[in-house]
Amino acid sequence: MARKKAALDFEQSLADLQTLVERLENGELSLEDSLTAFEQGIGLTRDCQAALAQAEQKVQILLERDGELAEQPFDAEQPE
């Protein structure tokens, strides 16, 4: 369940970030609102980057064999 929550949190953060970017690009926000949105966007970006880094670490751990890391490119088409 923790994995689903983490995935949902990442997806929600990414969706929120996309919404903020659209609002900023629209150009209808005041300077103060733009700065607030920008600050929120920075926080969401950091959250997303942290989630991606954590996912990358998990993938590397799963690929570990015989005490050595065997890095392999991710291939979504490759059967498990």
Swiss-Prot record:
Gene Ontology MF annotations: exodeoxyribonuclease VII activity
EC number: 3.1.11.6
Statement: the UniProt record of this protein carries the keyword Hydrolase: yes
Reactions accelerated catalytically: Exonucleolytic cleavage in either 5'- to 3'- or 3'- to 5'-direction to yield nucleoside 5'-phosphates
Domain of life: Bacteria
Alphabetized UniProt keyword annotations: Cytoplasm, Exonuclease, Hydrolase, Nuclease
Localization in the cell: Cytoplasm
Enzyme class: hydrolase
SUPFAM superfamilies linked to this entry: XseB-like (SSF116842)
GO cellular component: cytosol; exodeoxyribonuclease VII complex
InterPro entries documented for this protein: Exonuc_VII_S, Exonuc_VII_ssu_sf
Gene Ontology annotations of biological process type: DNA catabolic process
Protein task: Bidirectionally degrades single-stranded DNA into large acid-insoluble oligonucleotides, which are then degraded further into small acid-soluble oligonucleotides.
NCBIfam families named in the record: PRK00977.1-4 (NF002140), xseB (TIGR01280)
Family classification: Belongs to the XseB family.
Subunit field text: Heterooligomer composed of large and small subunits.
Protein name: Exodeoxyribonuclease 7 small subunit
Annotated source species: Pseudomonas fluorescens (strain ATCC BAA-477 / NRRL B-23932 / Pf-5)
Chain's gene name: xseB
